[in-house]
């Protein structure tokens, strides 16, 4: 056993020389594990684990929105091992870290200085290696399970939006954000084969002539029958520009068909559109790398097809959980020509940003209405707040979710990732909507009747109570308002709810079809915005 004195010297040295003996250990590639592990045990790499923990601890201590000492998060991370074996407990007292297994002391190690990230990473690894000798559950847990337990512990006392994703989950997250190499289909499993239910536009699948109802039987000669969705997706996806050959059965044909295509960069569809009586209604489901481009394309095509008969735009953000901040900025910029869109403020220098509009308003000055509800969050709230504060849109619905924080993604050496809160969002009028949300000018909370008369009644009631609505909006947009009871009362003025019916869309159409009415509704927030200066 290594003595406490030697351990203390080792962890203190880590801040000066990196991981202890790392250059030598790299050459030997985990010498302690050269012998095969005992039956049931899993291989645990000291070098890899220390590297992963150091990267995670460093990212959290440097970038989290509030200061967090490395020692504090490391202790919480070690406590997280209890998720694998509840008999494992740890305490930190008198400069020592003590590990217990079922109440019995297993080891007592000297703690590094609180800010020594590398030292705490090395200590965490040594605690785990020692704990594996005392815990069958930990011996048989793979490294990913250990990482998950530790980082869940590390993040347990931070905000609810900071979280860890293992390598597999992180891969899926990156596909949602950044797209993936694929062919552009949606499918479900029917009779043990993938049945195509949708072909995405402008994708290899569309170009190759794939159609709804086709059943894929083979991909590059590999039978697909009986495979699960994950296995099928892993076969269909691959590096962009790589070739894939599909064999399929098509309704109405007896012989199998073979088609070949090259994979392309595929983005999940986030934009859908319909046009009713000259009003363009665009639903934005989330914000990924392709959202702003897709929205711009929809708006330009709508303008080309409608010409001067285009009356206005409804941007439906209900149920939109958010996504990429820069995409929300670009979406806002499509409808604004000047002024601030949003600012972000955090502890790390790179988290402080001021985003300004400089677009060309693809709605051409026509009325814009934004629909929000209690599930409109994050990037969706950025768009709603920017268009409302810049007097460009009337916001209709319920108070939004109130996720006014920004997360950065820390990619770890194991290909997992930590999503970490590192800044707060500040609306152009100066208020922070974290825990508060965006307040619609026309509130539909608790309204259940979808009739057209109900839409007119709500508009009439809001406009007749103009002073009350404006007083609420002035209080809502008070910069620096942190009093939780006041913020709660403000949210109660328009309770956050999930809205999926057509009432909000009917109100939007009423406003767009009556320019004078739209202007009166817009002035509800425009006047309160001016009152702040």
Regions from the PLM with identified roles:
Residues 56-62, 131, 205-228, 314-316:
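Conserved PDZ fold ligand-binding element
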Residues 177-181, 189-193, 210-211, 238-242, ...:
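Short flexible coil/turn linkers enriched for glycine and charged/polar residues
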Residues 30-162, 471-533:
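Terminal targeting/pro-maturation regions of precursor/exported proteins
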Residues 4-20:
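Bacterial N-terminal signal peptides that target proteins for export
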Residues 17-29:
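Bacterial N-terminal signal peptides
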Residues 144, 149-151, 156-198:
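PDZ/PDZ-like peptide-tail recognition elements
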Residues 157, 192-195, 217-219, 231-271, ...:
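PDZ-domain C-terminal substructure recognizer with occasional recognition of PDZ-binding tails
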Residues 31-34, 41-57, 267-533:
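C-terminal "post-core" interaction segments
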